[in-house]
Amino acid sequence: MGLICGLAIASGLTVTIPSEAQTISVNEFFPPVNRYQLGASNLGNGVNQVTSVAELRDVQPSDWAFAALQSLVERYGCLVGYPDRTYRGDAEGTLRARPLSRYEFAAGLNACLNTIEQLLQENVSVAQGDLDLLKKLAQDFQAELKQLAVRVDNLETRTAFLEDHQFSVTTKLYGQTITSLDKVFGDRVGGGSNEFQTQFAYRVRFNLETSFTGKDLFRTRLQFSNFLNGVEQTGTNMTRFNYDDNSNNNVEVSHLWYRTPLTDNLTLRLGTVGVGYTDLVDTLTPPTIADDALGIPSRFGEYDPVYRRGGGGAGFNWQITPTVQLSVGYLATNPNDPDPGNGLFNGGYHTLAQLAYQTADGGIGFTYSRSYFPAGNTDLMAGTGSLLAIQPFGEVIATAGNFYTLQGYYRITPHVQIHGWGGFVEAQAQGGGLSNLSNGVGGTVLRDVSWNSSAIWYGLVGISFPDVGGEGNLPGIALGIPPTVTASNLPGAVGQTTPYHLEAFYRIQLNDNISITPGFWVVLNPEANSNNATQYVGHIRTSFLF
């Protein structure tokens, strides 16, 4: 005993209503608005249709269709715009107080179609008279419903395009402040009392990080500081900190750098000032270690000295596979100086190529770099190691160096990680003449340099323990040999013995923004000479990140 009602909505759609359950299959009732598509059957019948005048005029509040739709809105809440689930339009209590265009009316009708469809899905009873009313309205506004579907599809396509391509240029400010209480103990290199007084100094950085596309990064860094490196007081660079910058409290643009992907696997990095290899490639050292504010405090212990190059230039990173990356870079020491012997290509420069393998737990890489320093500007080891390793042929002789280095790290467990690096440098004098070389005990010795060469070795191993003693904490130790000249064909230009660097530190993370790092390191045989007193360096570093 079933009652079968044929309800045609749009083109030949029928709805079957079983009388026992008084429910209607949604798919058998009416399709969503996106089914109203123009098809060949509508256009290919060979008969030119003449549009009725009634199909062109607006729907007036006095029209039966207007009243019919308003009754559906009131009974089923098709158009809900206010907290009390009513739609008030231009006059409270009405669908609209003014005439509606046929497309406005079709939009309201479509809303009621969707609402009643939802009710049928939930097995809610719908009056037969209302179904008949919907049938009549859908037939009268079939053309507008079809066009509405097309317009909605076009709007969705345009919206998706805007979501994929629209990006608002965003700049974020990041701040970092380091304060440190430092003291060096032990007689000065070469004898005499150590004049390094207890130092309490600071360094402040503000990074303005901007993205133009959502995938690139442009960084501008403002920095001011008042640290002194203490070399004059101790007689060696082996006691230096990695944050001992000094701008005499003047604000300066210390870093200008840009990174952008060129393809899915190729990235360009470039900058004009304060750019180092650390901005072009990965140092293959745990990020918790290679960080001025949060990592190991000594200059030598932070990362391989091969990366301590600065100036302006560019680099490319090619991600060959998800774990293998090839990087190349070029830096000029004074790219902004147009004087002879300077500039981007006619002064001091550094080139680098690095092949690295990295996974989530660690990585290893081989790095080759060549550096050239004009006469009067030699700093081969970038302020680390012995003075003889920094200037193996003295300051007045132009010097080149070929670096062959290996770096790696591995996270054994979530709370144990190891790292290390080692390097060999082939130093070459780029000319000749009389030059004063460091004698390793605080003085110099005069030598006649003539295209000589020297060998420099260095290395370090370390172990650290992330989150041991508290979340964010980092205790660690390191043992290394600072850069030292081990062989030379220039008489008197070799270190007398091997220096050693032993360091321990413990970063205590007070909260997300503040940490305190007490620690110390010991330098045995500073300046590669056993006649020098052992240097003891102590510090308490406090870092603020915001």
Swiss-Prot record:
Residues 52-123 form the SLH domain. It comes from the Bacteria. GO terms for molecular function: porin activity. GO terms for cellular component: membrane. Pfam families: OprB. InterPro entries: Carb-sel_porin_OprB, Cell_Envelope_Struct_Comp, OprB_sf, Por_som-like, SLH_dom. GO terms for biological process: carbohydrate transport. Signal peptide: none annotated. Belongs to the OprB family. This is Uncharacterized protein sll0772. It comes from Synechocystis sp. (strain ATCC 27184 / PCC 6803 / Kazusa).
